[in-house]
Regions:
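Short acidic/glycine-rich loops and adjacent helix/strand connectors
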Residues: 2-189
Length: 189
């Protein structure tokens, strides 16, 4: 599957800033951000590519969560009954701000100017994932991140994939296909 098909499948607005060129096959620089359920840190990496193939990697960075934020996230994950329907907007804003700070730190350390970045994809912090029930809850506010970064943001990948009958991990196969496409078969990913 190509990135353009992924955007369409997930009903992601392909060009939220109106530049008109995010879906072309010219080289684009994308930053991806994820944090695992261990909440040990925020992983940031950058790839440049055409939407079909990766043409250059720009390294990565892991920024640990602050101890109090990590402790609060882990406590919440241990009590799933507190997650469904709960108002977690304050915690979500703190998580979002931490993720934005990680992106800004990464761009600075990698020497990446924000004007070069086409899009930043944020997974958010998963606090409850029950794909059999079609339910997943990530803490992340994409609109807040876009305002803080002033870069187009895509987020909430799991919800659309779950709604389409998936397991809530729509980017992993596309990412692996893009990275492995230049390799000679057979391949094990």
């Amino acid at each position: 599957m190509q990135f353009t098909e992924l955007f369409k499948m997930n009903k992601i607005q392909p060009d939220p800033c109106g530049s008109g060129d995010i879906m072309t096959h010219a080289d684009k620089l994308a930053i991806g951000v994820i944090s695992g359920t261990s909440a040990d840190g925020i992983d940031v990496a950058a790839l440049q590519g055409t939407g079909i193939a990766v043409t250059q990697t720009h390294g990565g960075l892991t920024l640990p969560y602050a101890g109090d934020l990590r402790a609060e996230l882990l406590a919440l994950m241990r009590t799933p009954e507190r997650v469904r329907g709960a108002d977690l907007s304050d915690l979500e804003a703190r998580v979002t701000t931490a993720h934005v700070a990680a992106v800004e730190g990464f761009m600075e350390s990698a020497g990446i100017d924000r004007d070069r970045v086409t899009v930043v994809g944020f997974h958010g912090q998963t606090i409850l994932h029950q794909p059999a029930d079609g339910y997943s809850r990530q803490l992340f506010d994409g609109a807040l991140a876009a305002r803080l970064l002033q870069i187009p943001v895509v987020a909430d990948f799991r919800a659309a994939d779950l709604a389409a009958g998936g397991e809530g991990a729509p980017l992993a196969p596309v990412y692996h296909q893009a990275l492995s496409s230049p390799l000679t078969p057979p391949q094990v990913i």
